[in-house]
Amino acid sequence: MNIVILAAGMGKRMQSALPKVLHPLAGKPLLSHVIDTARQLSPSTLCIIYGHGGEQVPQLLQSKDLSFAKQEPQLGTGHAVMQAVPQLNDDSPTLILYGDVPLTTAASLQRLLDIAGADKLGILTVDLDNPTGYGRIVRENGAITRIVEQKDANEQERSIREVNTGIIVAPTKQLKTWLANLSNKNAQGEYYLTDIVASAVADGVQVVSAQPDHVWETHGVNSKVQLAELERVHQNNIARALLEHGVTLADPARIDVRGTLTCGRDVSIDVGCIFEGDVTLADGVRIDAYCVLHNTTVGAQTHIRPYSHFEGATVGTACIIGPYARLRPGAVLGEDVHIGNFVEVKNSDIAAHSKANHLTYIGDSTIGSRVNIGAGTITCNYDGVNKSRTIIEDDVFVGSATQLIAPIRVGKGSTIGAGTTLTKDAPADKLTVSRSRQITVDGWQRPVKIKK
């Protein structure tokens, strides 16, 4: 099967220099949603028609299974499909999709393909209470005879509620002939793809139709308002699927999934959370309000407190994280690790039962089990040129306001006194401290402010 995706439109109402089909919905371009759906149908040819925005579309979406054809100037949908003709295989049908209609499901498209087979012209249609702006499906004795655009329709035709979604499948050899015979003698001066319906009828090719499971599958995006509306539709669909899977959502209207969210049993998600990329939450995970998780895996029974931000992290079981914690790429936490408020962890492994509860930076470090990191501790991993690692072995106690100048190793069971700046390895099972001796100055008085 051939699939052609029309993605050349300017999108003037978007009020943006970015091509319309590259605007994001749920974290990825509109066009990428359509491509992902098309791939589920296993096409032999997948051709993207681009135009507005120059080379941005092919540059962003390069892939071995995609081909591209440029439409310049843009003279209508029929003219757009003409640009793909050299790439279409005559021996299989051609399905035409739209880069700004992102939510059509593969199931609805497969239904259309099954009805059309290899020798019929198939049209995906919907019935609308208000069909204004859509091409009307004109039938005679139940059979589709043509599609008339809104601007070319008479009063009787405008009363028709069944409309064309634009999604069409056609036998390719005949499609090429019909495209070659298109005329632009209409109110828009464009070559309408819909005119092939009349050509098919004239050639004795049966025209059939199918309808999607949901009307929103055919909604397109022509403005930021429509984009926002479709974003809510999509997020509501995701929220419903999560609820049906057993996830507890404090408010289904206040969750955003911009990628893939996989949840185990008894997962609870509070309001305002955002999930980006691939996120996996194991059984019993609890996420409090306004957390952001990007490409992160969270182990069972872990509790993430409010306003925490994870990116590229792996969190073990029964951990307590936050509030206001930040896990950056390469953060790997073992079982029962506690990361508290205003603690940042980057490119570090922290083993089971260790804690850093307050105001700490842990970067490029390996931390053993049962380690306590005091408030205000900083691993000084960067010398202005190179980054070095800090190694803290099991059962270490690091006092508050400590700086560890990497590369450095803290031996097993050692204690680092509060306020220490550690520049050499600390031996195991001993107290290491480096700070000036405390003194008291008798008779000292504070300076007095000088009057000006």
UniProtKB/Swiss-Prot annotation:
Signal peptide: none annotated. InterPro entries: Bifunctional_GlmU, GlmU-like, GlmU_C_LbH, Hexapep, MobA-like_NTP_Trfase, Nucleotide-diphossugar_trans, Trimer_LpxA-like_sf. Keywords: Acyltransferase, Cell shape, Cell wall biogenesis/degradation, Cytoplasm, Magnesium, Metal-binding, Multifunctional enzyme, Nucleotidyltransferase, Peptidoglycan synthesis, Repeat, Transferase. Acetyl-CoA binds at residues 375, 381-382, 400, 418, 435. Binds 1 Mg(2+) ion per subunit. Residues 246-452 are annotated as: N-acetyltransferase. HAMAP family: GlmU. This is Bifunctional protein GlmU.
